[in-house]
């Protein structure tokens, strides 16, 4: 679920709104209702780094945390994927940081250290944002949360997706052959969940998430796949939450999309091993974390 999830959501919205003439006008109210439903403000401490308002309408640098949440049944779940995106429209650039889910760090508000993805189980998106913000020492202005269990509805809404699979494997009840394959929503969910059979581990899983997301963007970019736009909007409404307002989404789609032209993917260096309690953690050296902090703060033009 790499960088383009943000512009996939905004892109579909943009296609629906500015796609053309009476068709776009006729569905405006449906899109507007969907955006109202997915809006969920953050609860922040007053001293949070991300509380200072970023003026998206004036194209100021901005940061967004993307959370892929694995919720099954009545379980609250954990953040299956954590990706921080920084956008600087002044030089049309974007940086995306994939944060390993097993990263050992302080869980803000819990009074202890644990795997970073546990923050969501302890305190939802509010605690997740606060924890990542402290871990990287950068302000997080906005978030987009996607329920990965319901992600299959989004894939099915665009008619399934095609991907090129570089590793044959089985996951759940599905077999995934090597090469070009078509995925239904249920298959896409299993495809993006597998990591234990992949020698690349969590990084391989993140790559598959990116493949599926890019394929969804490709399908969503054509009107032929959006004739059932109601299904797309329903899937988004049920499975996406964000503190971006409707106006901010439209401004971002308009003012920030060129940032894709100059994109840098960043993997956090570290070492994974079992701790004394027998639990596997991913440890990030302080020097490596500080280098990353400096790079992100410079990209966001943060000086204090």
From Swiss-Prot:
What are the transmembrane regions? 5-25
Q: How does it sit in the membrane?
A: Single-pass type II membrane protein
Q: Which GO terms describe its biological process?
A: cell wall assembly
Hey, which stretches end up on the Extracellular side? 26-304
What pathway is this protein said to act in by its record?
Answer: Cell wall biogenesis
Enzyme Commission code: 2.7.8.-
- Which sequence ranges are listed under topological domain Cytoplasmic? 1-4
User: Keywords for this entry?
Assistant: Cell membrane, Cell wall biogenesis/degradation, Membrane, Signal-anchor, Transferase, Transmembrane, Transmembrane helix
Q: Which Gene3D superfamilies match?
A: LCP protein (3.40.630.190)
Q: Which InterPro entries match?
A: LytR/CpsA/Psr_CW_biosynth, LytR_CpsA_psr, TagU
Spell out the subcellular localization from the entry.
Cell membrane
Q: Name one GO cellular component term.
A: plasma membrane
Q: Which Pfam families match?
A: LytR_cpsA_psr (PF03816)
What is the main EC category here? transferase
One Gene Ontology term of the molecular function aspect: phosphotransferase activity, for other substituted phosphate groups
Name the domain of life this protein comes from. Bacteria
Give a short account of what the protein does. May catalyze the final step in cell wall teichoic acid biosynthesis, the transfer of the anionic cell wall polymers (APs) from their lipid-linked precursor to the cell wall peptidoglycan (PG).
| Similarity comment | Belongs to the LytR/CpsA/Psr (LCP) family.
What is this protein's record name?
Polyisoprenyl-teichoic acid--peptidoglycan teichoic acid transferase TagU
Which gene does this sequence derive from?
tagU
């Amino acid at each position: 679920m790499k960088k383009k999830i943000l512009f996939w959501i905004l892109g579909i919205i943009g296609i629906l709104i500015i796609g053309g003439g009476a068709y776009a006008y006729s569905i405006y109210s449906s899109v507007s209702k969907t955006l109202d439903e997915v809006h969920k403000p953050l609860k922040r401490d007053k001293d949070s780094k991300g509380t200072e308002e970023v003026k998206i309408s004036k194209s100021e640098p901005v940061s967004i945390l993307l959370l892929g949440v694995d919720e099954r049944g009545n379980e609250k779940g954990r953040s299956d994927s954590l990706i921080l995106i920084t956008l600087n429209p002044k030089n049309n650039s974007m940086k995306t940081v994939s944060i390993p889910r097993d990263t050992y760090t302080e869980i803000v508000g819990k009074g202890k250290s644990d795997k970073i993805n546990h923050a969501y189980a302890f305190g939802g998106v509010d605690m997740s944002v606060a924890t990542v913000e402290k871990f990287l020492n950068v302000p997080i202005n906005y978030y987009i949360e996607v329920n990965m269990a319901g992600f299959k509805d989004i894939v099915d809404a665009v008619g399934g997706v095609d991907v090129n699979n570089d590793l044959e494997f089985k996951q759940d009840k599905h077999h995934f052959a090597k090469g070009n394959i078509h995925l239904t929503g249920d298959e896409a969910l299993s495809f993006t969940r597998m990591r234990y059979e992949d020698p690349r581990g969590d990084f391989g899983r993140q790559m598959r998430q990116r493949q599926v997301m890019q394929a969804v963007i490709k399908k969503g970019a054509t009107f032929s796949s959006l004739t059932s736009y109601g299904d797309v909007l329903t899937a988004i409404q049920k499975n996406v939450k964000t503190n971006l307002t409707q106006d901010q989404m439209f401004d971002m789609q308009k003012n920030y999309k060129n940032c894709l032209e100059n994109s840098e993917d960043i993997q956090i260096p570290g070492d994974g091993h079992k701790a004394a309690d027998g639990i596997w953690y991913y440890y990030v050296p302080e020097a490596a974390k500080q280098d990353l902090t400096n790079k992100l703060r410079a990209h966001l033009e943060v000086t204090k």
